[in-house]
């Protein structure tokens, strides 16, 4: 049994070079065949990092750990939002923090505040990880203007959840009770009634073993995203060297994906135009991903939040 575990592959690479194959994967995942979360990226060469972290560190940032020191969340956030033309969002984040501090007597750091705003229905581009393959496909092509391959990362929840639960259990035994931020997020995860009006709501389900992950409309936002990526790294492998295997689309769809908690779908740039048509056909537009509605978080701040 131990040898089998050691021989198990960790990451698969699947190249998709036809729109027909892409449609098959879309149908496969949208039917719920496999418990995955997805991240779409405009460049297949990028590692699996959040948009915020990638902007801060460029391509020097490695998936297996960080080569940077600690910086205040506000510096990260301001720089990222300014570079992406979303400076107004930072003002809204500060306003949210002010309201939260007034109501609950706790000052949120900027990243936590940004994540909670999105949780309450406010559009945000801070992290584009989804339970929907099609939503990830949107992010893999949104604003793309280069002839480079895109990518969709798929993380198999079923395969990592058991070990993740053991990791968090050991951490709790070692460090005692979780801090107030984790307790707060757990509380918010139970507030399902705020999901009713938005188009991408999905239950938290198997992801509730990650205490700092917030689900909103099928999209995930993490106030401590670097912590999640690091814990995911430890979950997938006990050492920094991934075992990588390349497989065909047919092999994956026929069940060969079972030994791969992490899958990278490389989308050939040769099908870019056809993908654009597919997104239009599925009505996956900016307006649908980021609903152009009046933010609803103010009303939801009145929900009772406990720290017990």
Feature annotation, model-predicted:
Residues 1-308:
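Catalytic-core elements of nucleic-acid end-processing and repair enzymes
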């Amino acid at each position: 049994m131990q040898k089998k575990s050691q021989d198990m592959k960790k990451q698969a690479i699947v190249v998709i070079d036809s729109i027909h194959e892409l449609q098959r994967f879309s149908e496969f995942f949208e039917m719920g065949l496999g418990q995955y979360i997805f991240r779409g990226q405009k460049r297949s060469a990028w590692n699996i990092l959040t948009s915020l972290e990638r902007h801060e560190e460029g391509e020097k940032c490695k998936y297996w750990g960080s080569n940077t020191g600690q910086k205040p969340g506000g510096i990260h956030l301001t720089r990222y939002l300014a570079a992406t033309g979303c400076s107004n969002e930072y003002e809204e984040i500060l306003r949210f923090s002010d309201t939260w501090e007034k109501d609950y007597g706790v000052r949120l750091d900027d990243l936590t505040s940004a994540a909670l705003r999105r949780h309450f229905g406010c559009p945000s581009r801070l992290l584009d990880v989804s339970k929907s393959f099609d939503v990830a496909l949107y992010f893999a092509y949104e604003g793309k203007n280069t002839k480079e391959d895109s990518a969709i990362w798929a993380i198999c929840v079923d395969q990592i959840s058991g070990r993740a639960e053991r990791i968090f259990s050991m951490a709790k035994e070692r460090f005692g009770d979780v801090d107030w931020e984790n307790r707060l997020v757990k509380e918010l995860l139970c507030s399902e009634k705020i999901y009713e009006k938005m188009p991408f709501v999905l239950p938290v389900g198997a992801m509730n073993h990650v205490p700092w992950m917030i689900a909103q409309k099928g999209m995930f936002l993490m106030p401590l995203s670097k912590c999640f990526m690091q814990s995911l790294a430890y979950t997938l492998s006990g050492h920094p060297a991934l075992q990588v295997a390349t497989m065909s689309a047919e092999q994956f769809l026929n069940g060969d994906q079972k030994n791969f908690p992490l899958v990278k779908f490389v989308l050939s740039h040769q099908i870019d135009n056809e993908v654009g048509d597919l997104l239009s056909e599925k009505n996956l537009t900016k307006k649908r991903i980021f609903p152009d509605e009046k933010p609803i978080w103010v009303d939801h701040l009145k929900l009772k939040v406990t720290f017990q």
